[in-house]
Amino acid sequence: MIITRTPFRVTLGGGGTDLPSYYSRYGGFIFSFAMDKYMYLNVNRPVADDFIRLKYSQSEKVEKVSDLKHEIARACLEKLSISNSIEIASMADIPAGSGLGSSSCYTVGLLHALHTLKREYLSLHRLADEACNIEIDILQKPMGKQDQYLAAFGGFTVLEISRDGKVLVTQANVSSGTLEDLKSNLLLFFTGVKRVNKKILGEQSRSTIQNKKKVIESLHYIKESGYRILDIVKSGNITELGKMFDEHWKYKKRMAKGITNPEFNKIYDAAMKNGALGGKISGAGGGGFFLFYCEEGKHKLRS
């Protein structure tokens, strides 16, 4: 039996520049950190029969991998040429549709478990790259590369994506004092809406390819602010994060319909009136979590 634990991620800067439509022209930059919230996968080879069993929010029992409804599990098993006698069960601290990288956590965790089951060692970089191949190339999801790399590497991670899609991974040097301040001052709030990012990311990618000025300018700003946020965190002067998040949110809303709505705007305005210095929505937007930076009045903001 193999058990894997893969972390969810929160993006601090550069979100959206990891999409092929952008980085293939301008290069991408991401600064994210892994949370202490996880996706757990349990993989086992039963000896009693040859069935393929899958447990997630649903349960599946099939004779052929091709009959699986869960597309990520199906693609992973096919890629590793595992065709029978396998049990896969998953549990997570955070539900799907959170904007925190849940699908990639599942992909990375499952690939890690399956390779381990086959006694195959993969570097973290190759594991992330293989997960990208599954989600982006095979399943044709309109998504970027950060979720897979953050799930594989964890920590405070910087991704620099070249125009040819190669990813340079470095770990940001964050002091213990700054880490404690971030833990204290960054607050996540669930919007109550599970998002489906395909439509939003698809629109963003099309607008980038069509060279729509508003979207390109927003992504350029978001990438530049990512570098500045990295410098802020490394310097320890994290009060500036609130202002940076607030500016980021203004640009983010311009990139696609559905990123925000009147209810989300009310949530954001209420947070700003009750102690938050700035905030941003997780992932592509349209649901999931808001991340707010707040130094004082946290109890008031939570209420």
Regions from the language model: what does each represent?
Residues 100-124, 152:
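DPxDG-like acidic metal-binding loop motif
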Residues 79-98, 130:
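Glycine- and acidic-rich phosphate- and metal-coordinating loops
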